Amino acid sequence: MLKESCDSCKSNTIALSGGLDSTIIAYFLKERKPNAVAIIAKDFVASDLTYCQRVSKEFNIPLTINQVSTTDILSAIEETIKILKNFNDIEIRNNIVMYLAIKWAKEQNSEGIITGDGADELFAGYSFLINKPEDELEKEIQRVCSVMHFPTQKIGKALGIVVESPFLDEKIIEYSKTIPSDLKVRNEGEKRHGKWILRKTFEKNIPMQIAWREKSPMQDGAGTVGLSNLFDSVINDQLFLEKKKKIEETDGVIIRTKESMHYYEIYRNLYGVISKKQGDSSCPYCNFNVENSKFCRMCGAFPI
């Protein structure tokens, strides 16, 4: 079923992180000799590089390691905020990686790019799911799947690139619902793993170290997690406190970190101040309408 979904992809470019999901896709498409691209920050520590190189060697597929400078990343931040229309630091940090990968594909005159989107939601890959009690896990997986969204689609549309995600094929989505939660999250040896059924199914087809590699967010793998320390070091503490106070007084927005402040200032210059809605469904930090969610997609506040 997943092979069929991969084979139906028209693009011949893979966004490769060297994680489980993109490696499974590379395994199914290896006979095509697809082009793979990995985004790695030059100036920060990135964990994906070795794994991407291992996948490239294992499946004999060409790999471009696109090493991006801090200047490239700062430019990508502004473009990503412009497209996603939020200043959620975690979402921005992760999705500038995909912005840079999709931008690279466009520069190579590719019409599309293939991603591993969806596997973490459908097969319980997120770290916060791993330690959920058994009686809560199934409901939590269902909740995650009901609100899943993929900013890569917005980025691709903005850049004129088709984003194809084999795990989000309707047949796979429906099939994933029939898999018991104890096959999605389970112990293997002494460790508890999300996406257990995917790992077990493909452990003989892909490198073992990748099959059982712990979930690594894009921001860690590409190195953009280093942005937090960058902003902490370049923004003066006193200036931060002064700006934080002014923004809270004038805009009614509570800024939590220096990184968030940088993103908010870009967002505000582009889209202005968020209007406060009537009722109890507004985020207490930024006034965005969150309905019944504990997570604010606009500013990244959690729990609220």
Residue ranges and their predicted role:
Residues 253-285:
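Short, charged low-complexity linear segments at domain edges
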Residues 25-26, 75, 123-126:
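Short glycine-/acidic-enriched loop or helix-start segments at secondary-structure transitions
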Residues 1-14, 104-110, 266, 270-278:
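Phosphate/ATP-binding catalytic cores across multiple sugar-kinase/actin-like superfamilies
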Residues 49-84, 115-117, 122, 171:
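A conserved beta-strand->alpha-helix junction
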Residues 91-106:
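A conserved donor-nucleotide-binding helix/loop in the catalytic core
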Residues 113, 118-134, 145-251, 275-279, ...:
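Mid-to-C-terminal catalytic subdomains of enzymes
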Residues 25, 48, 93-97, 164, ...:
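Hydrophobic (often cysteine-bearing) scaffold residues that line and stabilize catalytic clefts
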Residues 12-62:
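ATP-dependent adenylation/pyrophosphate-handling site
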